[in-house]
UniProtKB/Swiss-Prot annotation:
Residue segments, region G3: 63-66
Keywords from the UniProt entry: Cell inner membrane, Cell membrane, Cytoplasm, GTP-binding, Membrane, Nucleotide-binding, Ribosome biogenesis, RNA-binding, rRNA-binding
Similarity annotation: Belongs to the TRAFAC class TrmE-Era-EngA-EngB-Septin-like GTPase superfamily. Era GTPase family.
Gene transcribed to yield this protein: era
Region (G1): 16-23
Protein name: GTPase Era
Ranges for region G2: 42-46
Sites where the protein binds GTP: 16-23, 63-67, 125-128
Entry's Gene Ontology molecular function annotations: GTP binding; GTPase activity; ribosomal small subunit binding; small ribosomal subunit rRNA binding
Gene Ontology BP annotations: ribosomal small subunit assembly
Residue ranges of the region described as G5: 155-157
Residue ranges of domain KH type-2 in the record: 199-283
NCBIfam families, sorted: era, PRK00089.1, small_GTP
Length: 300
């Protein structure tokens, strides 16, 4: 840290149960789509940094997988471990909860964050959907009783309600530091990682409840040739039947997945994209620690 610096910089963990709006919150704060979203729980599998630099303040957000009770497969253990690890060595923790709904998985997260010694903010999401705001007060009071040292803030990650106030509160808690990243950098993740995540998002939005959790995406080629970015993506599934579902009747579903992913890639990478998708069966990959490591899932 330089002497008499007026700049602030620090890490902010975004935690909560699956499908509560953590990635939507990150995307709205950043002002662009970075983290993938869907209505299905456990869409986020990896911790990912989203970096926002505004004036003298650089907030480095850690978007985490939702903490959940299922721990039966190596992939589930990896996601839970990633989410828990994010609580360490950060400057601020944001605990995202729903405006009224409280689940066993919310309770699981609460039991972890109650040991946080630094600043803790409970972001009560989706409050824009409540016609009678007075109905929210008992829930806010109950949350405050559970975590007396936390600050409770109603927000809407989707609509952006009260996010300016949330960011201002976060900035107050960040330590005085030189900025860790260049002003124009928005993530620590590679373009190949982001491309794979966009394909996986489109699959999750198209398919049924169970199948998406047995699918992962690997980028085999990522090459800029002139004005066109060529991306070859391999979709891994665990059974032949799953491969047929992804391909769809006469290849219609995989064409739709590819078309939607390509549009988002062209916006993200600011380039024309030629996207090719293949589907391959790799039985039991989601419970094979060696396979998970080879697919970029880190330490298990």
């Amino acid at each position: 840290m330089t002497e008499n610096t007026s700049t602030r910089c620090g890490y902010v963990a975004i935690v909560g149960r699956p499908n509560v709006g953590k990635s939507t919150l990150l995307n709205h704060i950043l002002g662009q789509k970075l983290a993938i979203t869907s209505r299905k729980p456990q869409t986020t599998r990896h911790n990912m940094l989203g970096i926002k630099t505004e004036g003298d303040v650089q907030a480095i957000y850690v978007d985490t997988p939702g903490m959940h009770k299922a721990n039966d497969k190596a992939l589930n253990r990896y996601m839970n471990r990633n989410a828990s690890a994010a609580l360490k060595d950060v400057d601020v923790v944001i605990f995202v909860v729903d405006r009224t709904r409280w689940t066993d998985e919310d309770q699981l997260v609460l039991e972890r964050v109650q040991y946080v010694t630094g600043p803790l903010i409970i972001a009560v999401n989706k409050t824009d959907r409540m016609e009678e705001k007075a109905e929210l007060i008992p829930h806010l009071q109950w949350l405050q009783e559970q975590l007396p040292n936390a600050e409770v803030m109603p927000i809407s990650a989707q609509q952006g309600h009260n996010l300016d106030a949330l960011e201002a509160q976060i900035a107050k808690h960040l330590p005085e530091n030189d900025h860790f990243f260049p002003e124009d950098q928005i993530t620590d993740r590679s373009s190949r990682f982001l491309a794979a995540e966009l394909v996986r998002e489109k699959i999750m939005r198209q398919l049924g409840a169970e199948l998406p959790y047995q699918i992962t995406v690997e980028i085999e080629e990522f090459k800029q040739q002139g004005h066109v970015l060529h991306i070859h993506a391999l979709i891994l599934v665990e059974r032949d039947g799953q491969k047929k579902i992804i391909i769809g009747d006469k290849g219609e579903r995989i064409k739709r997945i590819g078309s939607e992913a390509r549009k988002d890639m062209e916006v993200l990478f600011d380039s024309k994209v030629m996207l090719n998708l293949w589907v391959k069966v790799k039985g039991g990959w989601s419970d094979d620690e060696r396979a998970l490591r080879s697919l970029g899932y880190g330490d298990l």
